């Protein structure tokens, strides 16, 4: 059995990784690490794990935990990883990191959008961007994998076939995306309290959300030219799920059916990418609890514009599910191993 340690196991992303891996046929969780809950059973913190997975949480001490696992998943806040990842690298461990620290090719871009100094620029050469559908070979050979953000995953995969085939105006792409509240993590900040979120729908970080730069980086690599996007995130009063509505002006005449066939061909070997037939559009209830992304589109002939819609679970394909997909790659397993569960629907 392959062995994995989860550092930051008691946050929403961490515990979702536990939920997915505890029943994985080929990967064994050998350490769960939580600074705040060290010495307590994780099932005491999350009672849904009672009688299923009751491992005691380790303290965050790399010297003590390093030998427990071959690969470590770090689910820590941005910037905090610099206290952990270099030590794991020194001990020869591979890491799947959920912070933004290893998602960027450029230190300058990271520091501009995160308004922080990158604490580990010397390690970027060891890293790969963890979106398997676009960077599978790089992931196989990397020591550190920067797990993508949820909004970028939902947006990049929705746009990739159009951008790669140079079918849209690359200077006028608009992305409106809405996320469930779990995307903010397990914290007590006022904007995420029940009375602030319930029966409320709001935009935030308009024109300056840090995921803008992540989306632009990956689309620019695909297009082999600089791409800029207008990205606006929204908060939806639901626990999990994400829906992106993307507008792009076509630079040639294409029908809805032609573009759907293009998408199906582009993603024909990608198990987790589901391209919907003409007349059908994604909904969050179809993907919540799964690692799938559903993509649908409509061409507005009047404006010669394509509207692409994509849906993921922000905790699934947007975080924990994608991390398990990456772990499968690192261990030489089929990517769908342990991830074939459908969405909850209800």
Swiss-Prot record:
GO term, biological process aspect, one: L-arginine biosynthetic process
Presence of keyword Oxidoreductase: yes
Enzyme class: oxidoreductase
SMART domains: Semialdhyde_dh (SM00859)
Active site: 150
SUPFAM superfamilies (UniProt xref): Glyceraldehyde-3-phosphate dehydrogenase-like, C-terminal domain (SSF55347), NAD(P)-binding Rossmann-fold domains (SSF51735)
EC number: 1.2.1.38
GO molecular function, one term: N-acetyl-gamma-glutamyl-phosphate reductase activity
Keywords for the protein's UniProt record, in alphabetical order: Amino-acid biosynthesis, Arginine biosynthesis, Cytoplasm, NADP, Oxidoreductase
Catalytic activity: N-acetyl-L-glutamate 5-semialdehyde + phosphate + NADP(+) = N-acetyl-L-glutamyl 5-phosphate + NADPH + H(+)
Keyword Plastid annotated: no
Cystine residue pairs: none
Pathway named in the protein's UniProt entry: Amino-acid biosynthesis; L-arginine biosynthesis; N(2)-acetyl-L-ornithine from L-glutamate: step 3/4
GO cellular component, one term: cytoplasm
Location of this chain's protein in the cell: Cytoplasm
Family classification: Belongs to the NAGSA dehydrogenase family. Type 1 subfamily.
Task of the protein: Catalyzes the NADPH-dependent reduction of N-acetyl-5-glutamyl phosphate to yield N-acetyl-L-glutamate 5-semialdehyde.
HAMAP family per UniProt: ArgC_type1 (MF_00150)
Protein name: N-acetyl-gamma-glutamyl-phosphate reductase
UniProt organism field: Acetivibrio thermocellus (strain ATCC 27405 / DSM 1237 / JCM 9322 / NBRC 103400 / NCIMB 10682 / NRRL B-4536 / VPI 7372)
